[in-house]
Amino acid sequence: MPASMKDRVAIVTGGTRGIGLATARSLLDRGATVCITGRSTEQLADALTQLDAGERAIGVAGHAAEAAHQDATVARVMAEFGSVDVLVNGVGINPYYGSTSDLPEDVAIKMFRTNVLAALAWFTRCEQAWMGEHGGSVVNLSSAGAYRGGPLLGSYGITKAAMIRLTEQLALEKAPRRIRVNAVAPGTVRTKFAAQFWEGNEEAAAAAYPLGRAGEPEDVAEAIAFLASDDASWITGQTLAIDGGLLLTTLVDSLA
């Protein structure tokens, strides 16, 4: 039986759909109280309706990369629940598909700010509010693209590789404070974010994976919940590939 997360409070950024929403549900199923974030109040309301967890789930609207939203979210969680035991950095963007050498500087800055620096900022606030004194668990969302480049996706992969290195560094620095920091690196998951890689071409997408299918949000969510829980109490600084075996293949094989 999975370890109970009763009396644990989690923040899941980007928690209104896809992997983030599935993660919130998995944490709730283990007994945690969860705060999800998202940019749209309508999407937050819909997500909370789907979660159907009553007072154990709240939502805060705002831009995940903005300091004011980070401050307001952590302050509300502390005021309502008294702790921040788990942080899941689930927000990521990929607004550019093309050659990395042609990546506009302003887009590069936006990607790095949202995909990497925001994760650090959220961590810092959670550490200052609670984790620095009481310990905690952080799970960052990276990508299989961090390990292997592909056409048009190199820039996104670079930010996700940085996320892995950030995970390792924070894990090393914060272990004495009993803060565990890990990451997950999914392959193609059937979400709106990754729709262009599977929607309308599911057979080809599945063929790229030795296990014969693209991932589901729940595949990733359950791994995140495991890493966040006491089941992973002696695991830190690790990145778990959840990719249906994709990284076992070569780039040539996956594109054949």
Residue spans for each PLM region:
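Conserved mid-core segment of classical short-chain dehydrogenase/reductases
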Residues: 71, 94-109, 132, 152-155, ...
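Residue(s) in the substrate-gating loop at a strand-loop-helix junction
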Residues: 143
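Short, small/polar-rich loop/turn modules that mediate ligand/substrate recognition or access, typified
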Residues: 175, 180, 235-237
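Alpha-helical segment proximal to the catalytic Tyr-Lys
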Residues: 128, 172-173, 233
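Catalytic Tyr-X3-Lys loop
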Residues: 101-120, 139, 163, 211
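Conserved glycine-rich cofactor-binding loop
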Residues: 16-18
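Short C-terminal tail/terminal secondary-structure segment
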Residues: 94-97, 225, 236-256
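Active-site helix of classical SDR
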Residues: 123, 159, 167
